[in-house]
């Protein structure tokens, strides 16, 4: 017997009568005729568990750092040594970018002793500082640079065992010389550097409204290497508008984040939080005049969902990812599903996980960034379908209007067996 979820339409909430007292409004408590809602407390995840970072270089301005914290981030990004105190005061962590180190990491002629001397000088001030997550090394290296970057990474770990060297990789199709293909590029990185994680960037949303299938191909490739080497991966997604990339929308942010979650990612960064002073860059969370834009609220919303789902998500192990239709190259289709016999209602990405007690979990994602959609699904086994709310973190029986997904949105479901 299969467990089936059917979509039903409930009476619109607008038909309900709402009464709000001044005291309730202050506390964020709204009394409806049929239910009462209290604004939930959102606890930010630790970056060691799930990194949420505004990608780029962040000033030591107190208000700017407070805004980053309020937006749901647990990292401040890259900061110069003199700004570390401000990061600590804001309750964030950071990667330190030292001008005496990062410009020299591609210098293959520098001896190990010279590297260690520079690294020791950099880390000496911050070894016991809880706000220093690690140290910036390099962005987007080609494979021939891995060996030299490894020397710097080893020196950092030797000087400060708790520190993480930051190296971010190129996207699929842009890996450059020195590797046979993208899979080889990732494999070389994991083997040569012995890295504690994989970070990469890939921007796949365009101003004609399209989403490149390479979004999923890249996630597929990184997930395989991540699982093989038992290291987490972080994804840098599009958080501003530039070149021929799309204007920032909630649907676009939703898809990039929920797709990363469906593939088992353990970190999200947004390129960029501060708008660069160049070209057609726009729609970043903070514009060129240091004013917050509507993108800031969009980021806060999706970051809130990451932080709310996190306590459940972090207990899960990724076991499969598939597309029910429109299967991209190098990806799997519905016939690979471990838990579901049917998914209907649109074009979806589904991540499958095993949770505590061998509980089946699925994260279903609407691949349409422009339109909402209802969905239906059938589990292969019998049981009660449950949903973990992205707004409260509570897991309750699934049904009713929860069977709708916003553009790019996702839903975390599980099967409670009898």
Show which residues each predicted segment covers:
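Positively charged n-region of N-terminal signal peptides that target proteins for export
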Residues: 1-5
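Bacterial N-terminal signal peptides
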Residues: 7-17
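Sec/Tat signal peptide C-region and signal peptidase I cleavage site
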Residues: 18-22
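Glycan-processing catalytic domains of CAZymes
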Residues: 23-383, 387-418
């Amino acid at each position: 017997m299969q467990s089936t979820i059917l979509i039903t339409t409930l009476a619109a909430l607008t038909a309900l009568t709402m009464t709000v007292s001044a005291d309730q409004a202050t506390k964020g408590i709204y009394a409806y005729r049929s239910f009462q809602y209290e604004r939930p407390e959102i606890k930010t995840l630790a970056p060691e568990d799930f990194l949420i970072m505004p990608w780029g270089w962040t000033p030591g301005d107190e208000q700017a750092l407070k805004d980053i914290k309020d937006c749901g981030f647990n990292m401040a990004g890259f900061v110069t040594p003199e700004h570390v105190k401000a990061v600590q005061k804001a309750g964030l962590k950071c990667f330190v970018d030292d001008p005496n180190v990062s410009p020299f990491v591609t210098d293959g002629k520098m001896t190990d002793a010279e590297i260690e001397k520079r690294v020791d000088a950099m880390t000496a001030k911050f070894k016991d500082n809880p706000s220093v997550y690690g140290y910036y090394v390099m962005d987007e290296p080609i494979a021939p640079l891995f060996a030299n970057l490894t020397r710097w990474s080893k020196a950092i770990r030797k000087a400060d065992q708790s520190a993480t060297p930051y190296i971010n990789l190129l996207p699929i199709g842009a890996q450059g010389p020195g590797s046979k293909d993208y899979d080889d590029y990732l494999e070389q990185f994991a083997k040569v550097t012995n890295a504690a994680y994989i970070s990469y960037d890939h921007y796949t949303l365009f101003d004609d409204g399209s989403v490149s299938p390479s979004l999923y191909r890249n996630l597929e490739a990184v997930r395989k290497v991540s699982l093989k080497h038992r290291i987490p991966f972080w994804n840098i997604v599009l958080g501003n508008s530039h070149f021929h990339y799309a204007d920032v929308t909630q649907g676009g942010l939703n898809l990039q984040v929920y797709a990363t979650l469906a593939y088992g990612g353990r970190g999200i960064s947004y390129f960029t939080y501060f708008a660069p002073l160049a070209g057609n860059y726009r729609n970043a969370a903070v514009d060129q005049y240091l004013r917050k834009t509507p993108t800031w609220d969009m980021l806060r919303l999706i970051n809130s969902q990451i932080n709310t789902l996190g306590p459940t998500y972090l207990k899960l192990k990724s076991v499969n990812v598939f597309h029910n239709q429109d299967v991209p190259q190098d990806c799997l289709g519905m016939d690979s599903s471990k838990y579901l016999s049917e998914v209907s209602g649109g074009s979806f990405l589904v991540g499958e996980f095993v949770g505590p007690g061998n509980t089946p979990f699925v994260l279903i994602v609407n691949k349409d960034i422009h339109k909402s959609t209802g969905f239906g699904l059938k589990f292969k086994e019998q049981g009660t379908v449950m949903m973990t709310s992205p707004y409260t973190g509570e897991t309750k029986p699934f049904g009713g209007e929860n069977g709708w997904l916003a553009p790019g949105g996702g839903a975390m479901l599980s099967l409670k067996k009898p």
